[in-house]
Amino acid sequence: MKNVFKALTVLLTLFSLTGCGLKGPLYFPPADKNAPPPTKPVETQTQSTVPDKNDRATGDGPSQVNY
């Protein structure tokens, strides 16, 4: 039984260590100081207060219409 726990401990340790550093460094490299700033303009989106479609029925109750 002790051999099983030792083997599982070794396998778990090796398995957890294999993931270390596989995707490169674990930090972000410093930004390039000569890189130009982004040139894409920021577009502001405004939301209308009037709905595009009226989803009410002919009376005051809501409709079950799927557009």
Swiss-Prot record:
A single cellular component GO annotation: cell outer membrane
Membrane topology: Lipid-anchor
Lipidation (N-palmitoyl cysteine): 20
Domain of life of the native organism: Bacteria
Keyword Transport annotated: no
Places the protein is found: Cell outer membrane
Ranges annotated as biased composition (Polar residues): 42-51
Main location, first listed in the record: membrane
Null allele phenotype: Inactivation of the gene impairs LptD oxidative maturation and causes the accumulation of intermediate oxidation forms. It prolongs the residence of LptD and LptE at the BAM complex.
This protein's record includes keyword Signal: yes
Disordered, as annotated region: 26-67
An annotated GO BP: Gram-negative-bacterium-type cell outer membrane assembly
Signal peptide: 1-19
Covalently lipidated residues, kind S-diacylglycerol cysteine: 20
Family: Belongs to the LptM family.
Quaternary structure, from the entry: Interacts with the outer membrane embedded portion of the LPS translocon formed by LptD and LptE (LptDE). LptM binds to sites in both LptD and LptE, forming a 1:1:1 heterotrimeric complex.
Record's function text: Component of the lipopolysaccharide (LPS) transport (Lpt) pathway that promotes efficient assembly of the outer membrane LPS translocon (LptDE) by the BAM complex. Facilitates oxidative maturation of LptD by stabilizing a conformation of the LPS translocon in which LptD can efficiently acquire native disulfide bonds, thereby activating the LPS translocon. Might stabilize an active conformation of the LPS translocon by mimicking its natural substrate.
Name of the protein in question: LPS-assembly lipoprotein LptM
Species of provenance: Escherichia coli (strain K12)
